[in-house]
């Protein structure tokens, strides 16, 4: 079993911890707890870079090793890092579990060392009509991020 963690930080009082685990070649399980967000849906993605020197903006685009368009987690044509939305309750917190086959913790496509980002707005899952639909899901600004690191 390989485990990883990302501790979210933000200039907007958003905080949280995201845990990743993968057993062999099985899908990766992502479990998160985030607080300080506005209620509703928020885009949630693995980004290409583990660089936060310029805050969440320096994490680069969504992780996309296959060069595909943005989509929903269940779509075949999607960025590997497209994990959809997390749902935030009226109290500003979200607790969630996601299982995904395109974000391994080992091998050449590993997400270790990459960024994970919570966005300000809902991800339209590549199905909206906005000019950013096919690249970012029109999910808005980056309100919190962390770097995915191996956990002992």
UniProtKB/Swiss-Prot annotation:
Catalytic activity as recorded in UniProt: 2 superoxide + 2 H(+) = H2O2 + O2
Residues that, per the record, bind Cu cation: 45, 47, 62, 119
The keyword Transcription belongs to this UniProt entry's keyword annotation: no
Keywords linked to the UniProt accession: Antioxidant, Copper, Cytoplasm, Disulfide bond, Metal-binding, Oxidoreductase, Zinc
Gene3D superfamilies from the UniProt entry: Superoxide dismutase, copper/zinc binding domain
Disulfide pairings: 56-145
Pfam families, A to Z: Sod_Cu
Binding residues annotated for Zn(2+), in chain numbering: 62, 70, 79, 82
Highest taxon above the source species: Eukaryota
The protein's required cofactors: Cu cation; Zn(2+)
InterPro entries assigned to the protein according to its UniProt record, in alphabetical order: SOD-like_Cu/Zn_dom_sf, SOD_Cu/Zn_/chaperone, SOD_Cu/Zn_BS, SOD_Cu_Zn_dom
Record has Disulfide bond as a keyword: yes
Chain's role: Destroys radicals which are normally produced within the cells and which are toxic to biological systems.
Similarity remark: Belongs to the Cu-Zn superoxide dismutase family.
Protein name (record): Superoxide dismutase [Cu-Zn]
UniProt organism field: Capsicum annuum
